Curated annotation (Swiss-Prot):
Matching Pfam families: Ribosomal_S9
InterPro entries membership: Ribosomal_Su5_D2-typ_SF (IPR020568), Ribosomal_uS9 (IPR000754), Ribosomal_uS9_bac/plastid (IPR023035), Ribosomal_uS9_CS (IPR020574), Ribsml_uS5_D2-typ_fold_subgr (IPR014721)
Protein family membership: Belongs to the universal ribosomal protein uS9 family.
A GO MF label: RNA binding
Protein name: Small ribosomal subunit protein uS9
GO cellular component terms listed in the entry, alphabetical order: cytoplasm; small ribosomal subunit
Membrane-spanning intervals of the chain: none
GO biological process, alphabetically ordered: translation
Residue ranges of the region described as Disordered: 1-34
Bias kind Acidic residues: ranges: 1-15
Annotated keywords: Ribonucleoprotein, Ribosomal protein
Length: 168
């Protein structure tokens, strides 16, 4: 009987050594996590990119998207834009916790997706600054992309494209 107990203890010790655990994982489990506030607060913000402007409301719900009266998949058929817009929720582990209601105008699909992502990130930041701001800031989702199209200059064909010049 004593021999059986020793072998089971040895097997358990061996399982602990061979299991895929890391020291950092153990440290994270030991450290108490900050409690997030209940998902009852709504947030609203404006996001801009290129010529696009997105007015966004983030409301606690089931993860439903309404963009200009249409679903996310209908408004952004491109999967890349859908993923881009969803990133702030994924990075904060809030996927499906909030409904998004947005009005977007101006620009093209890429600019609109960028504006919507910025608006969502700002809304989530407004909801819970203590927990969300550092994560969103580190990922770069709270930074407004200031790149815009350069204006056309007089005497040139485009912003920088000039007529071909022959020296001789």
């Amino acid at each position: 009987m004593a021999q059986n107990e020793e072998t089971t203890e040895a097997v358990e010790a061996e399982e602990t050594l061979t299991s895929y655990t890391s020291e950092s994982g153990a440290a994270e489990a030991a450290a108490p996590k900050k409690e997030r506030p209940a998902l009852t607060v709504a947030g609203a913000a404006v996001g801009r990119r290129k010529e696009a402007v997105a007015r966004v409301r983030v409301v606690p719900g089931s993860g439903k998207w309404i963009i200009n009266g249409r679903e996310l998949a209908n408004y952004f058929p491109n999967k890349l834009h859908q993923q881009d817009v969803n990133e702030p929720f994924k990075i904060l582990d809030l996927d499906g916790a909030y409904d998004v209601i947005a009005r977007i105008h101006g620009g093209g699909p890429s600019g609109q997706a960028g504006a919507l992502r910025l608006g969502i990130a700002r809304s989530l930041n407004e909801i819970d600054i203590e927990n969300n701001r550092a994560i969103l800031k580190k990922a770069g989702y709270l930074t407004r992309d200031a790149r815009v199209i350069e204006r056309k200059k007089a005497g040139l064909k485009k912003a920088r494209k000039a007529q071909q010049y022959s020296k001789r």
